[in-house]
Design a protein with these regions (language model features):
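Asparagine-centered polar/low-complexity signal
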Residues: 6-7, 76, 161
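Conserved alpha/beta catalytic core and glycan-binding cleft of carbohydrate-active enzymes
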Residues: 10-11, 16-23, 27-47, 125-126, ...
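Active-site neighborhood of glycoside hydrolase catalytic domains
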Residues: 71-146
Length: 192
């Protein structure tokens, strides 16, 4: 099953309720997650922190992060409540007999934070393995081989190696040059 933990739809009830709540705050008033727990589910800010931050609908005082697009707000995966939500998602699918997840956009959970992303992956993978010892996880980390190799610290058993199959990737280069040793050396980077 493909699991998109990085973001939700801008139409998701968590996001729409959080936006309605923020739009109703008075200028300078801080959000209270005991009043609206969903304000902690996303990366909201009272200032536009970069080009991936968009105005909260109905508010000129609040912004949210959407790394891929304004219609896909980023979830706050450091939030224990969000982590619990994904444990419930895992429970649902594992109880139905699913024995593996493809983790979408794993390197974007927290931007430029490999260690934090590895912790997030490890926590969910460990949870799933406790539910099903045969559980398998593969993570999408669309990056260089060196960055992908760093993500193995998460304990996740497999990462996609998109670069290996590109026109200039290790697989194509090995075939073009008749040099299988270069392919083996490229793959060994993941082992070490």
């Amino acid at each position: 099953i493909d699991v998109a933990m990085n973001h939700s739809s801008s139409q998701h009830p968590w996001f729409t309720q959080a936006c309605e709540y923020l739009a109703g705050l008075k200028a300078g008033e801080k959000p209270d997650d005991t009043v609206c727990p969903y304000v902690d589910y996303y990366h909201f800010s009272d200032k536009q922190e970069g080009t991936t931050y968009y105005a909260v609908p109905g508010s000129s005082s609040w912004w949210y992060e959407g790394s891929f697009w304004s219609e896909m707000p980023d979830l706050n995966l450091k939030s224990p409540a969000v982590q619990k939500e994904f444990e419930e998602v895992a429970d649902y699918w594992i109880d139905l007999g699913v024995d593996g997840f493809r983790m979408d956009a794993a390197m974007h959970y927290e931007e430029n934070a490999t260690n934090a992303n590895c912790d997030i992956l490890n926590k969910l993978y460990t949870y799933c393995k406790e539910k099903n010892p045969q559980f398998y996880m593969v993570s999408e980390v669309w990056a260089s081989e060196n960055v992908i190799a760093d993500y193995y610290a998460s304990g996740t058993p497999s990462m996609f190696n998109f670069d290996a199959g590109t026109a200039k990737g290790a697989l194509v280069n090995a075939v073009r040059k008749g040099d299988p040793v270069s392919l083996v050396n490229s793959m060994l980077k993941y082992q070490n």
